[in-house]
Amino acid sequence: MDANTKTILFFVVFFIDLFSPNILFVYAREIGNKPLFTYKQKTEKGPAEWGKLDPQWKVCSTGKIQSPIDLTDERVSLIHDQALSKHYKPASAVIQSRGHDVMVSWKGDGGKITIHQTDYKLVQCHWHSPSEHTINGTSYDLELHMVHTSASGKTTVVGVLYKLGEPDEFLTKILNGIKGVGKKEIDLGIVDPRDIRFETNNFYRYIGSLTIPPCTEGVIWTVQKRVLYFFCFCYRLIIFVTPYINIFWIFVFVFWCMLM
């Protein structure tokens, strides 16, 4: 099959993906075969019901500053904060599936960010697809969260949004780990968080919450304004290693590999 035909097929598949959000059904935090909560809207364990599923999750329904949100100029601050600085460095890391996402955890010292003279140590990063935050109503294909904690137990999360395009350096380097990921940790060796390319020159800042139960509030969110790109192969792999009931995309992926 020639290159033009492959290109046409890719864009047909892409636009089906873009306009078919109901194809994907996400289940998370399983005990045995029973999920504790899901991401599927309008179900008994979907986001609107999280606060009723466990007394410790009550704030998911009653909270006043819940995340994610639509990032608009009227709602949040778009700033260049001189009081924010990043000090990341390469360190040993592992990758695993948590059921609701794929997570890279730094076992060594991956560095920190400093916000208003408070240090927050980098703990882990994970992905959500499609993006949880939107910018002026626009959703993106992928969202990376870099989770940090302070010595006093406070949490700050850096969010980076992605859309399909050129290969992403960070995802490309951990691709083999993503391919084999499961509930058990896989050693990635040394992983450099600087490859994520989080920029501090323009970002959205607001106080919100964790985006999964128990939806704890008081989280400092920093979401980069610039949207990055990533290659579709990494995108599909991340989707496949999370528990999506997605027979359609399994078929598409196998078919596409046969054409390569």
From Swiss-Prot:
PROSITE patterns cross-referenced by the UniProt entry: ALPHA_CA_1, ALPHA_CA_2
Known role: Reversible hydration of carbon dioxide.
Keyword Disulfide bond: yes
Obligatory cofactor(s): Zn(2+)
Domain Alpha-carbonic anhydrase: 35-260
Protein name (database record): Alpha carbonic anhydrase 6
Superkingdom: Eukaryota
Disulfide bonds: C60-C215
Classification via Pfam families: Carb_anhydrase
Keywords attached to this entry: Chloroplast, Disulfide bond, Glycoprotein, Lyase, Metal-binding, Plastid, Signal, Zinc
Catalytic activity of the protein: hydrogencarbonate + H(+) = CO2 + H2O
Species, as recorded: Arabidopsis thaliana
Entry annotated with the keyword Electron transport: no
Residues annotated for substrate binding in this entry: T211, I212
Signal peptide: 1-28
Active site (UniProt): H100
Xref: SMART domains: Carb_anhydrase (SM01057)
Family statement drawn from the similarity comment of this UniProt entry: Belongs to the alpha-class carbonic anhydrase family.
PTM remark: N-glycosylated.
List of residues binding Zn(2+): H126, H128, H145
Glycosylated position list: N136
Gene (UniProt): ACA6
